[in-house]
Amino acid sequence: MSGEPIWVTGATRSGKTTFLIEQFRRWMQSGGRGVGGVTRAANSPVVLQTERGSATASAARSIARPLATGGFAPGVLVLAAIGDNRIDLLDRLTTVTEGRVSLHSTTPLGFFQEEVMLFWSLLIQQLDLKAQFPVRLAPENEQELATQLWRSALDRAIGQQATIAEGRLVRRLLDLLQLASLAGIPVTDVPVILDQGLNGQVDALPLPDVEVGDLLQLWQQWCLERGLLTYGIIAGLYWQYLLPHPVYQEQLAQRYQLLLADDVDEYPAIARTLFETLLDAGANAVFTYNPDGAVRLGLGADPVYLSGLADRCRVETLINRPVPCLGDTLEDEIVALVTDPIFFATLPDAIQAIQTTSRAQLLNRTADIIIEAVQTQQIQPRDIAVIAPGVDAIARYSLSELLANHQIPVESLNDQRPLTSSPVIRALLTILTLVYPGLGRLVDRTAVAEMLVVLSREAEGKGQEAEGRRQEVEDSGQRTGDRGQGASPIDSYPSPLTPHPSLIDPVRAGLLADYCFVPHPDRPRLLPATTFPRWDRLGYQASEAYQAIVEWIETQQSQLEQRLIPNAVSLLDRAIQHFLFGGGSLPFEQVSALRQLIEAAQHYWEVDSRLRHRQRFDAPASMTVSRFIQLLQSGTVTANPYPVRPIGPASNAVLLTNVFQYRSSRRAHRWQFWLDAGSPRWLSGVDSLFAAPLFLQGWSGRAWTAADTMDANERRLRRILLDLLGRAGERIYLCHSDLATSGQEQTGVLLSLVNATIPLDAR
């Protein structure tokens, strides 16, 4: 049937996205009115090639229906599973269109949020809400406020069943709301689902099912009354109230006449309702689907339910991959060997094993092989990926240091570390505790010493002048004997925390913190440097730098008393401008952390302002600052210290990532190193939310048992193997140590693969 939507299905890297882009290019060439199709049996396979005149062109049928009526340009909605994939897809589509077509590119959750914000007035009328602009809560704010709202119920539940931490219990409750909303399930049905699915598993959720439903409804109503939105509330508002609204449906049909949805196997169930609404309104669409994808299954995605859209589309099945990979020849053998370990076989040379006794030896041996391959120019670093079921700090640090010692950069994919892991952030938080009253219990001498080192950075120009003076002294053979005069060898200490020398080195900072810092629960303070009995040994530069920090803090305290500092965000900005020179000369990871700190602080005070206005009380500003500091110290707020797309030499880097992040990124490499191949986490790794299977549309309604969990894990492992094999070009190294870091023997499910290969050292 001419003009019907297209459903493109195929394995990993079979060319589905390229097919989608080719369809869009043909739509562009036809002026939005479709191109000529070909006669071919429905649902027949397509062989995708890359040469001109390939099956991509011959098998692509037109999107023939006119996309718009009237004089306005048709709207194009482009959806991708995650933000990074969205950027890549948008770049490729923009190249095809040469910027002549306006594309609205987003993710499903991003689209729901934009629509709820844009049509908030409709929801105000429908739900009888207060007319105020909504504010989206960040996850860290969401958990903090929910904990405060549910305090009595949480205390009662944890008092009766102390097997679960409070933070985890709150997170599970909030995740239930998000799962229900993404699945298109009313909150009122959650207790019934939990009763049927958990079958009274008190250890997992120590709250009565009815009370869980009441708490979720209380939270939802509390947020709506204050104009606060979370992802779970946004998704619920969208599918339950906004999408069925006739005014919205009319506007939606006018805005979008073409839908391009990539990787719909990663989309939530309510996305299908959106797609069907667009199709019913006459929009054309191209969907891509990977039957063995489902990376986000357990995080709100429902690939089986989304696959039902294929019944409304013309199905194009892509068989051959444009680029060869190990999956073409080995996927059946690998999967069979893992699922049936009794089946003995020998794997080809493309699969090699690195076996050691301890994990430390394994990390060193893995790094040695990578270094040798790069130095002998067998492969470029950018073509190597080290993939593990979970990358711990030991593996990340060890591999990064070992490779960096040989000038091989390492890219840690989406390595989101707590903000407080950055010394610069900790120093700024210490500044807050010294300026605002009542925060003395949040600071200690160690934090003060670190602050003195970090914030005594020397300006770039002054640092060069000082270096020149030191060089002159060395050239003339002079040596400074008096540390109180001139610049001593450690007066400008090149701290690893800062790119420029610090005027206060760690030793002097420790002495100053010990002798000049006065702890106090309400007003901790820094005394003059002369309080230190041997202050003459500090040196001129260190004394001056310390005194400048003390005077700056006292100035801010005075201005705070005069109400010249509106909030802590302003104070943080002042500190960054004064001590860190605006952050312009800092490494990227520190700039990223500073940016995330300011964004988190701005959002926190925006929410605080909304709550103060609603509750009509004026609590001390220090109370909000205290909560903010404790929130950061808990490690809830994170920042990605690396750019999305490294540039320069850093772009030619070995990729270090876990399985979930690697599959989500859709990358491919010539060589893959499967780290910790003997780990049980390949089968039982946790990458799903609590009770997620109960919120799939295909759930049977029976209680979820251990057998169901094992079956789901085995299907997940099969998808992982097929996906990784499809992204491996030439070689896979199975990296296995007999003992884990904890000293326990590793007998994971992939051990059958390790045993089927000849160890690398034995070749």
PLM feature spans:
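Conserved helicase core region in the C-terminal RecA-like lobe
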Residues: I82, T106-F111, L259-D265, Q596-A600, ...
